[in-house]
Amino acid sequence: MAAIVIVGAQWGDEGKGKATDILGGQVDYVVKPNGGNNAGHTVVVGGEKYELKLLPAGVLSENATPILGNGVVINLEALFEEMDGLIARGCDASRLRISSNAHLVAPYHQILDRVQERFLGKRAIGTTGRGIGPTYADKVSRVGIRVQDVFDESILRQKIESALNVKNQTLVKMYNRKAIVAEEMVQYFLGYVERLRPMVIEAELELNRGLDAGKHVLMEGGQATMLDVDHGTYPFVTSSNPTAGGACVGSGIGPTRITSSLGIIKAYTTRVGAGPFPTELFDKWGEFLQTTGGEVGVNTGRKRRCGWYDSVVARYASRVNGFTDLFLTKLDVLTGIGEIPICVAYDVDGVRHDEMPMTQSDFHHATPIYETMPAWDEDITGCKTFDDLPEKAQAYVRRLEELSGCRISYIGVGPGRDQTIVCHDVMEA
């Protein structure tokens, strides 16, 4: 039995999809425990590139059952559009299963998300506008719509009417928008009932019974540690807990059953949207990382902000997630750049901080303190073992390992599934 949690260690887009794709072929279940269609990832299989948004990367594995856990918020229109796209390409997306307790994104959530961001102007968070935040807000306010609700029309209608009593007041009186007709929302959800019905299960029961039977489970977290609503750069965060603890909550698997916590981390750092980013680059090197690394958001098409590796963030992520291992991605992007700066600490108003500053204000004012290491010029995209890497690349990896306080067990040297060096297999932990 193995229960492995995959967590982004930075601000997202670290390559979690690749890690899931590699490990997904060795497990029985791949679970997405949080998020929605607001965080895309790219997976390359057999030379084919797949851009996934709501579905877990495990849907591309022939052996694993992909599951959307209770912590996910689901846009049904986006879900079936993504599934149909995969089916058209020969993927058996019909194996997907969905927790009956997952919450649903309604069209009014998306409307509210967009008008609220527009209203905030320069103070906007930089959301994707897909209704994720408002859906989670309804969840914690106990007025959300769950998957199970669509199978009882009277409950569905009651919940929608109750929710719109408040939301229409907000839309009409505050944002000068038209009121939403409750019956239209009811019919919207009822239109998906028959296709949805065979996919819905008691996910926590299925997963725990699987673990009892010795099966392997992989939990594929969305977003990343620094976007966690509790542990991230609040308020520039997502609305869920994309950390190891959140994976337990969003799947129904208890923390004592977790065998490995695998952090996915780039050899440099990126971020999409607003918020503090101490190592962000505004010079030719930022442009180099963006261009060479292909740093464009899968969901939004926005260019990602780029910066050097931040070991303060890495140590923080290792601590709050209890990482047992790290998966270092995109090492090949740094080939041939001469010198590689590594942020080892911050300067905040003349005071050195080796760990994450306590306050939001201090983090906003943090200036990176760098050390540099020599880069390598050799092509590493064909390296199969750690010893195949040039000495300078090995030294860089070992230094990141030392600074992060966690062993690096996987190293990505290219986008392909086979372009991964395995130093330690977490399936054998």
Curated annotation (Swiss-Prot):
The active site is at 13 (proton acceptor), 41 (proton donor). CDD domains: AdSS. It is an enzyme of class 6 (ligase). SUPFAM superfamilies: P-loop containing nucleoside triphosphate hydrolases. Substrate binds at residues 298-304. It comes from the Bacteria. Binds 1 Mg(2+) ion per subunit. GO terms for molecular function: adenylosuccinate synthase activity; GTP binding; magnesium ion binding. GO terms for biological process: 'de novo' AMP biosynthetic process; IMP metabolic process. IMP binds at residues 13-16, 38-41, 128, 142, 223, 238, 302. GTP binds at residues 12-18, 40-42, 304, 330-332, 412-414. The keyword Ribonucleoprotein does not apply. Mg(2+) binds at residues 13, 40. Pathway: Purine metabolism; AMP biosynthesis via de novo pathway; AMP from IMP: step 1/2. Plays an important role in the de novo pathway of purine nucleotide biosynthesis. Catalyzes the first committed step in the biosynthesis of AMP from IMP. This is Adenylosuccinate synthetase. It comes from Corynebacterium diphtheriae (strain ATCC 700971 / NCTC 13129 / Biotype gravis). The lineage of its organism: Bacteria, Bacillati, Actinomycetota, Actinomycetes, Mycobacteriales.
